[in-house]
Amino acid sequence: MANGPNYKIKPRRRREGKTNYYKRYVYVISKQIRFIVRITNKYVIVQIAKIDPKGDIMVASAHSSELTKKFEWKGDENNTPSAYLTGYLAALRAVKKGVTECVADIGLHVPSKGNKVFYAIKGAIDAGLKIPIGDISIENDRIKGEHIAKYAEKLKSENLDLYNKLFSRYLGRGLNPENLPSHFEEILNKIKSSGG
């Protein structure tokens, strides 16, 4: 807690865990367009923003709930395939508006292997944006959700009750989780044909 007269309280958004002001300062100085990825407990949110003295200007954005509403995505809205699709959708919209290059802004997310943030960035790169991310290894089978399908197959044979409990949202929407990779391809083609 506060000790002595020299103690300074950190800014509110830093205390709330929303903004890293050091990184924010670097982005403002660089004046580059940011590719912002935020992962919540339910959704993936992707925004492409320009820096402006009055406040950030959103060039394009995508929310993983759009996958369900507009493109009939039947999987979870915050898993790895939906992160990829959301990044792809946002990038298509940005490319339409003339954006060609961005800088990744992952906020307070830890840049660790297998983080969904990098799958959203990979989706944007595949859609045509140039985003420098360095040496991050991205597994292509995880993009399609093959790891989820394999786990679902294994669980279905071992424990049907747990399978029904863990994949209740998939089953409620009419998708067998074992068919997730083919469903992913179908939704990706819908996004490509719609053009964002």
Curated annotation (Swiss-Prot):
Domain of life: Archaea
Pfam short name (any one): Ribosomal_L5e
UniProt xrefs under InterPro entries: Rbsml_uL18_euk
Keywords of the record: Ribonucleoprotein, Ribosomal protein, RNA-binding, rRNA-binding
Presence of keyword Methyltransferase: no
Gene3D superfamilies: 3.30.420.100
GO MF annotation terms: 5S rRNA binding; structural constituent of ribosome
Subunit-level organization: Part of the 50S ribosomal subunit. Contacts the 5S and 23S rRNAs.
Family that this chain belongs to: Belongs to the universal ribosomal protein uL18 family.
Protein name: Large ribosomal subunit protein uL18
Organism (species): Saccharolobus islandicus (strain L.S.2.15 / Lassen #1) (Sulfolobus islandicus)
Gene name as annotated: rpl18
